Amino acid sequence: MRCALSGCVRPGLTAIILCALAASAGHSYAAETQAWDAASSLAASASPPGLRLVWNSGSEDPAAALDRLERAGFPVAVALPPHVYYVRAEGASRSLLPIGFSFQEDGRAETAARQVAVGPPDAPEPRVSAAVGVDLDPFQGRNDAFPPIRLGSSPLRNRIARGGMLQGLPFGARWFDTSEFMIGRVAVSILFPESDGTTDPNRYNWTPALRDSVIRSAVRGLAKWSGFAASHGIALSFAIEVHAGLATRYEPIDRTVAEEDNWIEDVLAGYAGYRSDALTLEYDVANATRSRLGAQWSVLLFAVQNDTDPDGAFPDGYFSHARLGGPFFVTPVNNMNSTSATLDFYIEHEIAHSFWALDEHFPSNGWWSCQLTTGYFNQPNSNSVVPAPGYCGYRRGCLMYANYPDSLCDFTQRQIGWADLDGNGIPDLIETHPAVFPDSSEYRTVAGSPITLRGKALEVAIPNQNPYHYFLGDSISIASIDSVRYRVDGGPANQAVPSDGTFDSGREWFTATLPVLPPGDYVVEWEAWNSNGLKNAESQFTTVSLRAPSAPAGAGGGASASRGLSLRVGPTPSPGPVRFTLRAPPGSRGWGRIHDVRGREVARWRLEVPSSGTADWRWEGRVAGGATLPSGLYFVSIEIDGATLKRRLVISR
């Protein structure tokens, strides 16, 4: 099912997005025209530094176009699908562009762009786009980050309850997780409200030239973030949608921040085609855009026209501002008549708030103290000037500290999810591992027929420690299961088959069919690999025991009958204490070990089976030093007289 405008592309996600977002064919045509006009203007302008513009003359599905380019070896920094894609200049000539794409420099893009009259290519930028200088107070002592939204409305609670964990979202994410960390593809909807004069006098109107200048500023501001990410080995791209002429009864610049829900609700209700409260509409539209563009995250940018406003601010003195954690931010074209900070900078700054970065700038009586923590990893805001410059020992140039659009401090990096807590040079969120769970660790049957084994592979997300989620936020990974492999008795690797036909999500069921084997015992080793290129921390095994058709069945309660071994572990899940019962030949000796999902040993025992043939012991869920282990998945391995027994254990505190 594909709705004309709502982007009903991913079935699980769009089961919740109301098809009222599809609107009419005329609405869809208008949106396509706006995209073409904006793309044509970009094609006639200089590309951001370090990027090359790739033009697509077709109108294919935006997510498919982005995927085609990236599969061909062209990482996209910023895009305005379906026509404009900015790719990194370095290495861009080493691969062949997919069919239908061309570099702007070869003349084809310019020719295509000029088929539509869009005004002069050198249309003036907003007044705030003067040459960049250093202004230590680009917000002139005003707050621009407001507390996170409370998910309290009845319609929104219903959305959340119906949505759950939806197909098409990052693994573990839910409806309201629109910007948890800045890694992957981010959908950015630029919405242009237009007052119709019904309630407030219509004082400002968007012109095509002014609207295009905002889009160019957004491209440049977002390109900064993509460049920062590339320098850290992080894949980050922004896909932009443009929606102009969105009617509202109010003149947005004449309303206070406390009143902005009124005009936002007008704008989004007209766009979506149904009415609801502003908050529900914000998440509905953000999720629809996320689905259309095949993105992991989504942010709404409300551009406000006030180019000739004498004070360049809303009536309460605020100008550009954002809700911490999204799903939207607001940026007037004229921010307090600034002559040093560009509109590019304000967009670059505000989207960081959408991904949980805190301010660091003046005044020193602001709420963004250097002692606060934020973000997926609960990271400190140590570079803040609050309560005084250098109070927490740091004072560094940063785009959250002042007008430093080319500087990103390590504190902000960690707040938006780029933390490298293990110090190996790779951000933790792009080195997550999967886990693999065969349905059985022991399998017995009669030889003479193929054997089908089943199991599940699961991406293991790092726990979300965001304090604004009360440390109970959804644990999310943008990695997915890439493959499951198995080996029989250490032989060559074979590929397991995904039950749904494709390995493309964070949770996958699989089957593996062994050929006809002669009677005997075989060990099947399992490996799961994810899209990070990493495999499970500890391999899992299934012992297959095949007897001749005339041989009697063995006994042992899931253990090898010939060895007389069995292991019981429970309860699992456990709040902490776990009991182990090992049955083995009297006098058997060995070791018991427990590892976490990263392969680190957290517990160890020296084992000797007494004359009763049963060893029984209790573990309190603590490391040797006495520290309590966190909730999570753990792996038990018992090595006894040359045999290995493996079990899985879940601790849930």
Explain the meaning of each model-derived region:
Residues 553-596, 606-608, 618-619:
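Glycine-centered coil/turn sites that cap beta-strands in beta-rich domains
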Residues 594-602, 634:
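Short, glycine-anchored, charge-dense loop/turn motifs used at functional sites
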Residues 27-167:
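Autoinhibitory N-terminal propeptides
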Residues 549, 577-578, 618, 627-653:
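C-terminal tail/sorting-segment detector
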Residues 162-295, 308, 333-338, 342:
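Propeptide-to-catalytic entry region of secreted or membrane-anchored zinc metalloproteases
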Residues 321-413, 417:
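The catalytic-center signature of Zn2+-dependent metalloproteases
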Residues 420, 424, 428:
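Acidic carboxylate motifs that coordinate Ca2+ or other divalent cations, activating on Asp/Glu
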Residues 432-549:
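Long, low-complexity serine/threonine/glycine- and acidic-rich segments characteristic of extracellular
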